[in-house]
Amino acid sequence: MKRAFIMVLDSFGIGATEDADRFGDVGSDTLGHIAEACAKGEADNGRKGPLNLPNLTRLGLVKAYEGSTGKIAAGMDGNADVIGAYAWAHELSSGKDTPSGHWEIAGVPVLFDWGYFSDHENSFPQELLDKLVKRANLPGYLGNCHSSGTVILDQFGEEHMKTGKPIFYTSADSVFQIACHEETFGLDKLYELCEIAREELTEGGYNIGRVIARPFIGDKAGNFQRTGNRHDLAVEPPAPTVLQKLVDEKQGHVVSVGKIADIYANCGITKKVKATGLDALFDATLKEMKEAGDKTIVFTNFVDFDSSWGHRRDIAGYAAGLELFDRRLPELMELVGEDDILILTADHGCDPSWTGTDHTREHIPVLIYGPKVKPGSLGHRETFADIGQTLATYFGTSPMDYGKNML
């Protein structure tokens, strides 16, 4: 029985790439800077001392980090016995966004440039805004700017509740985000508005990667909170991913846990499981792994590393999240059968010590574990697509156009 379990620690970069200067990210280092802060006692917020990730270390994380940066992460064990295969991978795609990283992991790098709304104020074309107001019968809109998701709620949340005007905003990513109150505006109405925005952006040729519904609750600035009902409307990958090939060519199964299905615009996904928060995502993943049959991929995105701690530049929160993940990792490893492979990786960096609130261009770890996987270094990989090609070889699908098999 062949099964693959892919766990994306969203934004868990392990050191700046050679082309980081193109992105203003030279010196960014998600793992390294978290470890450094922990070793100095600067991340003792409910957790304490050096970053403690013994299970990820056994799978090769510290060795992969050393390969990427030439050093051992502060306070971590560079001499631990390694029981998995490990690599550090460079991104071939032109961006450092979530769809690019995930599609490339599945064998389809994004070699075109996404469209962006680069103006920080009055970010969206008036023609687009007018169409949205007319088609969705809106009383107007708020925002129309670059912002972080929490700041914009404090800024416009109360006015939104009074007026019913949705909050439109963007970031350095290729996104059109819409924040609305779950109770006063309504979740279904928000999702419908996002569908309209997706259609208008596609028809208008804006080449925007994702429309994101950002529902929230609360009654005044300071206590607004985003809920777990986020929904991403992505464009479809430009070519069949290894997920699609497994389903089409081998009649296999691909189980999405968390936001994976949204990222791939449901292409190559046969089952969707929603969960919010690290523990809930972990529990859902374990359940799906126990039930998975032959020719199945269980694919989970642990979004909190990015959305709750990376973008919010919360070093202590990120460290605590990693330690929680690490404590639970043996539960996953116990479910890896004789012919299975477990792959732990990331889709980009989001250094919580870095300036601004955006992603960082970094190498990602590729940690592969299974009874038949030979432990040791797989070296520097030139593209995340090596993961996709490895899966294509493993499941016996037609080869991907990019990437090399690592096993």
From Swiss-Prot:
**Binding locations of Mn(2+) 1:** D10, D347, H348
Question: Which InterPro entries does the record cross-reference, listed alphabetically?
Answer: Alkaline_phosphatase_core_sf (IPR017850), DeoB (IPR010045), Metalloenzyme (IPR006124), Phosphopentomutase_DeoB_cap_sf (IPR024052)
- What's the top EC group for this one? isomerase
Q: What EC designation does it have? A: 5.4.2.7
Question: Which Gene Ontology biological process is one annotated for this entry?
Answer: 2-deoxyribose 1-phosphate catabolic process
Report the main location listed first in the record.
cytoplasm
Keywords in alphabetical order, please. Cytoplasm, Isomerase, Manganese, Metal-binding
One MF term in the entry's GO annotations = magnesium ion binding
- Give the metabolic or biological pathway: Carbohydrate degradation; 2-deoxy-D-ribose 1-phosphate degradation; D-glyceraldehyde 3-phosphate and acetaldehyde from 2-deoxy-alpha-D-ribose 1-phosphate: step 1/2
Q: How is the cofactor bound?
A: Binds 2 manganese ions.
Q: Which Pfam families match?
A: Metalloenzyme
Per its record, the protein catalyses: 2-deoxy-alpha-D-ribose 1-phosphate = 2-deoxy-D-ribose 5-phosphate; alpha-D-ribose 1-phosphate = D-ribose 5-phosphate
Cofactor names: Mn(2+)
Cellular localisation: Cytoplasm
One cellular component term from this protein's GO annotations in UniProt: cytosol
Question: At the top level of its lineage, which domain of life is listed?
Answer: Bacteria
Q: Which family does it belong to?
A: Belongs to the phosphopentomutase family.
Please report the name of this protein according to its UniProt entry: Phosphopentomutase
Gene name per UniProt: deoB
